[in-house]
Each structure stands twice: as structure tokens, then as C-alpha cells.
Amino acid sequence: MAQCGGGDVSRHRKGHLDTVESLCQGLLDDVMLDDDKCRAMFGYLQEWQDLASMCYGSLGGEPPLAPEASNGSGSTGGGGSFRKRRPDDAKGESNSICKRQRGKQQQQQQPCHPDQMAAAVGKGRPERARPGAKKKAEVASPKDSPATSASTVTAGQKTDYIHVRARRGQATDSHSLAERVRRERISERMRYLQELVPGCNKVTGKAGMLDEIINYVQSLQKQVEFLSMKIAASNPVVNFNIVEDLFGRQLSQAACNPAALPAMALPMAQVEPSCLQMSPLQQMQTSAGSSGYGLEMVVSNQYSPPGGPMSVPAGASVEPCLNVNGAAGWDIGSHGLFSGFDAPFQSVQSDCLLDNLKMEM
């Protein structure tokens, strides 16, 4: 009998377990349809834990755990607000929990190296990238393009001039090149002057060279002035325009009044009208009898006589003018010439011969 009673009890417990499992499964399946029943059941289990332990203890199972309250408001009252749980969400949470557990187990199984630990510590707090750092990196490593490649090629080749950016107050490359050419030309001319000026090779610097060249040119100018003065003193140039005017006046008076013609000794060849013209290239030869020195004087006649070409009239007598010796004696009014031509013209016999004195006109 006792054995029969024990078998009945075990069968009764199994039947209770089956009924409880079926009820729980039905509640989980129909949680969306019958939310109030689910809340009531779990609320009762939470309120009377002893009752739940007694029920599950009598059935030989463990009591279910209390569900987590939403937003940390898990109260012990039966009327506590629980979040709605869908079966899909429950399955997804269970899957995620399993995955997390597996991942943790794998991490625990894998050995960690010290380098990996340091990298993990460094990656724990990522630093924020500064806004200017990216631009600097782009400028430091520009993209490959034909323009950049050309610039790198030109940068590799050294230029003769200094590269200057075209900014305000600064020159461009073309301007600097023109300036370099201009300075080269100036240096070449300075070399030529340095070769011409004696003693300029010893001077260093363009300023000193220019001072030396200026001093040399000034000394040359002074030498030229001194030489010109010396030449003028050795070869005096006499202007006989006054003498020509005097002769022209006397000849005009003689043409008007032949009796007033002074005693002038003229050769026959000079009586012709062509010989009486006062041309600048006419040459006259006279001699100083007393001194005996030959004096060569250059007569510069720039103007023709006021009366133009003059001729001696046919009625004028020139026979008294001839000298016995065959030479022509000139009656020169020296007193009237040096007294301002105020005194009357007085004829003075002179023994000057034409062969000894040369007068270039």
C-alpha cells in the first residue's frame, strides 16, 4: 500500500509540473492578448515570495526570477508599471546575451600582449582632430597633379635670380631678371672705364672707382684748358676788320676826289678792280726795314667791306705812287688808327717792303 501511495504522489507532482509549464508557456505566448493576467500573476509572485517558493518547492522546481522594472521603477506592489515585452524582443535580447557571453569567453581565452594592451589603453580616449591640422597635412602632402609636378621640376632646377612672390611692394621674377641684366651692363662699362683710367685697378668698390674716374676727367679738362691757352699765346690771331674799314673809307674818298688821294705806293697789278676787292683769302706781303724780323699774321675777315667791290676810276692817276726802287711804299695813317680815327689822315712814308712782311687774310 505504501508503494502504491508513493507512486501516486510522484505522478501527481509530474502532473502539476506539466500544468505549470503549460500555463507559463501559454502566458508567454498570449502576453500581447492578455496583458492584465500576466501582470497579475507576476505581481502575485513578487508580493508573496513565500507562496511562490512553496508552490515551486512542492512541485520540485526553482521559483522564477523577477523581471527587471523599466526605468529603474521596479516596485514590490502588484500595480507596478511594467514595460510591454514582445516575443521578438525577448528572443533578440537572449541572442545578444549569448553572443556577448561567447565574445567574453573568446577574449578571456586569447592571450593579451603588452603592445596590444598599450594600444587598447591609447584607444580608450580618442583625441579630437584640430581643424587646422587637416589643412596643414594637405599642404604638406599635396595631391599629384601636372601643375605640382611642373613646380617641383622648376624648383629642382636652380635659377640665376631670386624667386620673389608677387606681393605688394615686392618684385616679380621678370623684374628681378631685368634688374640683374641691367647691373651686368653697368659692371661691364665700369670694367672698360677701369681699363682706361690709370690707377683705377687699385681701387675696390664702385663708389671709389667712380670718384677716381671723376677726378681723372677733371684733370684732363684742366690740361686741355691750359694747352689751349698756351696755343693761343704762341699763335696770336689779329682781327683786321678795323684796318679794312679804314682802307675802304680812304678808297671811297679817293674815288670821289682824286686830288685828296694820299701818297700811297701801289703796284700796277693791284690797281685792277679784282685786286681791290677785300676778300678774306687775299694775302699781302710787307717788310719792316728797320727791325728786319719776318712777322706772319693771320687776318680773319668774316665780313665783306661795306662798299662791296670797289674800282678805281679811269681818271685817277697812279703814276706818282710808283717808287723808284720798284717796290710799293704804303702810306699808313698810323696816328689816325690808334687815336680812334678822329684826327685827319696823314700820310707817312714807310720803307716796308712787301717781300719781307706777310699778312694772311
UniProtKB/Swiss-Prot annotation:
Annotated segments matching region Disordered: 66-159
Residue stretches spanning the membrane: none
GO biological process: gibberellic acid mediated signaling pathway; positive regulation of gibberellin biosynthetic process; regulation of unidimensional cell growth
GO cellular component terms given for this protein: nucleus
Helix-loop-helix motif: annotated span: 184-220
Chief subcellular location: nucleus
Compositional bias per record (Basic and acidic residues), positions renumbered to this chain: 124-138
bHLH domain boundaries: 170-220
Subunit structure as annotated in this protein's UniProt entry: Homodimer. Interacts with IBH1.
UniProt biased composition (Polar residues): 146-157
PROSITE patterns: BHLH
Residue numbers covered by motif Nuclear localization signal: 166-173
Family affiliation: Belongs to the bHLH protein family.
Keyword Metal-binding attached: no
Location relative to the cell: Nucleus
This protein's encoding gene: BCL2
GO molecular function (one): protein dimerization activity
Gene3D superfamilies documented for this protein: Helix-loop-helix DNA-binding domain
Alphabetical UniProt keywords: Gibberellin signaling pathway, Nucleus, Transcription, Transcription regulation
Residue segments, region Basic motif: 170-183
Name of protein: Basic helix-loop-helix protein 79
Primary role: Together with BCL1, positive regulator of cell elongation at least partially through increased gibberellic acid (GA) biosynthesis.
